[in-house]
């Protein structure tokens, strides 16, 4: 648990959001929840080295998720934004989408991709979404989901059991 500290008292609930970090197989993931800007600033002040391969964020009610200073500290290889179609306030804004696009890393928005699942391996990870996006931790560029194996529609030859 990286945030909040026991004595933190922010007036907005989003600034007290729980922030978790884990290192799995040499890869680091950072879960920011709906952390607001004052909470992000406090986190950066306490822990300037927040480097993580994957960052998952929600959308705080006020201001935008993932300040530029926070992104500079994290240097993520993949960004997952947990947003939704409804209500409209839970959608990533065009301004946020544009700003994150400029980071030149894959950004996944759950309102478009559906659930994202990360499978950790000994020294790597693979991320898959319900929409068919697949990312490999060794080279996290968006990859199309491989086609399913072909199913034969031909009848199998009968087996004579005599």
Region spans (language model):
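Cap/insert and terminal regions of metallo-dependent hydrolase folds
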Residues: 42-117
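Core dinuclear metal-dependent hydrolase active-site scaffold
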Residues: 1-54, 62, 112-162
């Amino acid at each position: 648990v990286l945030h909040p500290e026991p004595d933190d008292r922010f007036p907005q609930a989003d600034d007290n959001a729980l922030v978790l970090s884990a290192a799995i197989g040499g890869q680091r993931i950072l879960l920011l929840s709906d952390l607001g800007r004052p909470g992000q600033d406090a986190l950066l002040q306490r822990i300037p080295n927040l480097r993580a391969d994957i960052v998952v964020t929600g959308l705080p009610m006020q201001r935008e998720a993932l300040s530029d200073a926070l992104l500079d500290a994290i240097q993520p290889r993949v960004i997952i934004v947990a947003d939704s179609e409804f209500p409209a306030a839970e959608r990533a804004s065009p301004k946020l989408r544009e700003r994150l696009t400029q980071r030149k890393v894959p950004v996944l928005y759950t309102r478009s991709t559906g659930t994202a699942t990360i499978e950790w391996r000994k020294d790597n990870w693979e991320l898959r979404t319900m929409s068919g996006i697949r990312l490999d931790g060794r080279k996290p560029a968006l990859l199309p989901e491989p086609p399913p194996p072909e199913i034969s529609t031909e009848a199998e030859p009968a087996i004579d059991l005599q």
